[in-house]
């Protein structure tokens, strides 16, 4: 199973385990709620998936790497208590609450979330003294004598023995009480995720060409060599940061993230070509429509003579640039929509007041609500940043009214309306620029490569990207719909070829 399917399986499990009847009672029998055990190679995204599931399902997440714990912190500390048995007082040993179980209750107190996921990573790499406690945890959902709170499901993760010498195999008794999901690296699934996350375009196009270099782990007499999904994602961040700082990027830097010399060297060479093609083909200038006809002809002539890899890379660069600009416009659009909703609430609030000075109370209440949401972990970092931006815009509007010495509510609302109108006009200009940019991309591909596989690749990329497909469905793109027939024809042609091959094999 790939990591995307595993994520969906966890989401479905949450829905099943946390289903309630009309009286608010959980319907799934607690004794049948098997913990999920994810077994897969390191760096494939198991921990990241848990964060995504918790955010999408709006439940809590408490994550622990069990190898960082001793038996005392996991099970609890022993304490002597006195009990009366048959009229005789006896000292016995009990245990304090496990640090892990206590952290779940602490999380519930702080956030108000009563349901969630307890995620235990590297569960099959525990020390010998902690191994029995882990088996008890998976079998009975308890640490020591304390149970995992109701409404919390258990997900554990570990690596196969081939990747870690510290791995302890679970016995059949334990495996018969969990839902074991084996996860494999899948380049296509990761590329889909990477496109949404804005991974560097050079990495996306390189792995589209050389999928076999996406993931590998070798343990030889010469040492350990590996390339993981985590490595590619971290490399993307450093590439973007160094490019902004105009710091030179060399093979040594890339080798720090891709710890397989041949792959690091190969990607370093591809990255240099990627940057050169971006400059030679003047991608940004073409999309902006700022290339004079002579330069455009030079770029097209260069593309017509190019190798398959170069043509593929140029197409991927165009797709990356288009996707990035559409994404920027959509974020702006979402910001304006949110601002419109806030201004409607502000207008209702001010109509009941005598002066626009009351706007300060409105802004203060919004900030207080935001602080409460952040404290309760009800917002992701990105959502919190968007809310903070909205509050700052409202504060700026308030300061502008004070600078103009406006205190009348009606006049203040009118001034804010004018400023919002200017924002909307700028948004419409950006929309037209984005639509024009999309048409420019199609025009260049047609002139440079004709209606060949490059155009098909570009069209397929736009269709497969949610941001691009939503933008095109909302605002249109004549060139896209014109070439949709090419995409459909190609799909039908491939289906016919497959049918022919099947018939010949029979």
Each model region followed by its residue ranges:
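Alpha-helical lid/collar subdomain of P-loop NTPases
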Residues: 196-360
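Sequence-level detector for tyrosine residue identity
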Residues: 17, 26-28, 64, 85, ...
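Generic hydrophobic, helix-prone segments enriched in Leu/Val/Ile
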Residues: 10, 100-104, 242, 420, ...
């Amino acid at each position: 199973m790939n990591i995307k399917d595993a994520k969906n399986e966890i989401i479905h499990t949450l829905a099943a385990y946390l289903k309630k009847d009309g009286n608010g009672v959980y319907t799934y029998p607690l004794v049948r709620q098997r913990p999920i055990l994810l077994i897969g190679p390191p760096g494939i995204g198991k921990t990241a998936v848990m964060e995504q599931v918790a955010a999408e399902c709006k439940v809590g997440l408490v994550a622990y790497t069990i190898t960082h714990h001793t038996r005392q912190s996991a099970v609890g500390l022993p304490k002597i208590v006195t009990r009366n048995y048959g009229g005789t007082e006896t000292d016995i040993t009990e245990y304090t609450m496990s640090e892990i179980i206590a952290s779940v209750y602490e999380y519930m107190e702080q956030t108000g979330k009563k349901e969630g996921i307890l995620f235990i990573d590297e569960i099959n790499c525990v020390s010998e003294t902690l191994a029995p406690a882990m088996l008890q945890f998976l079998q009975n959902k308890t640490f020591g004598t304390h149970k995992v709170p109701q409404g919390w499901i258990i997900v554990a993760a570990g690596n196969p023995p081939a990747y870690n010498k510290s791995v302890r195999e679970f016995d059949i008794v334990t495996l018969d009480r969990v839902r074991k999901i084996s996860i494999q690296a899948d380049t296509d699934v990761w590329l889909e995720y990477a496109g949404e996350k804005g991974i560097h375009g050079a990495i996306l196009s390189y792995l589209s060409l050389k999928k076999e270099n996406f993931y590998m782990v070798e343990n030889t007499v010469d040492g350990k060599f590996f390339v993981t999904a985590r490595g590619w994602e971290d490399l993307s961040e450093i590439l973007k940061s160094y490019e902004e700082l105009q710091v030179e990027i060399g093979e040594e830097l890339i080798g720090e993230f891709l710890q397989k010399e041949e792959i690091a060297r190969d990607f370093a060479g591809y990255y240099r070509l990627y940057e050169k093609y971006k400059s030679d083909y003047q991608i940004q200038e073409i999309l902006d429509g700022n290339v004079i006809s002579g330069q455009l002809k030079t770029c097209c002539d260069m593309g017509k003579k190019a190798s398959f890899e170069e043509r593929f890379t140029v197409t991927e660069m165009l797709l990356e640039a288009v996707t990035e600009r559409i994404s920027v416009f959509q974020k702006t659009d979402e910001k304006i929509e949110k601002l419109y909703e806030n201004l409607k609430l502000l207008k209702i609030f001010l109509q009941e007041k005598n002066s626009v000075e009351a706007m300060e109370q409105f802004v203060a209440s919004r900030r207080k609500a935001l602080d409460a949401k952040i404290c309760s972990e009800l917002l992701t970092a990105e959502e919190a940043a968007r809310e903070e931006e909205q509050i700052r815009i409202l504060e700026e509007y308030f300061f502008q009214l004070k600078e103009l010495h406006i205190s009348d509510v009606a006049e203040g609302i009118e001034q804010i309306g004018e400023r919002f109108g200017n924002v909307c006009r700028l948004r419409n200009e950006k929309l037209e620029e984005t639509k024009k940019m999309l048409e420019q991309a199609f025009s260049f591909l047609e002139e440079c490569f004709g209606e060949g596989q490059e155009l098909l690749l570009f069209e397929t990329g736009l269709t497969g990207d949610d941001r691009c497909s939503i933008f095109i469905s909302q605002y249109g793109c004549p060139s896209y719909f014109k070439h949709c027939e090419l995409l459909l024809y190609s799909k039908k042609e491939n289906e016919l070829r497959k049918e022919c091959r099947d018939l010949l094999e029979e």
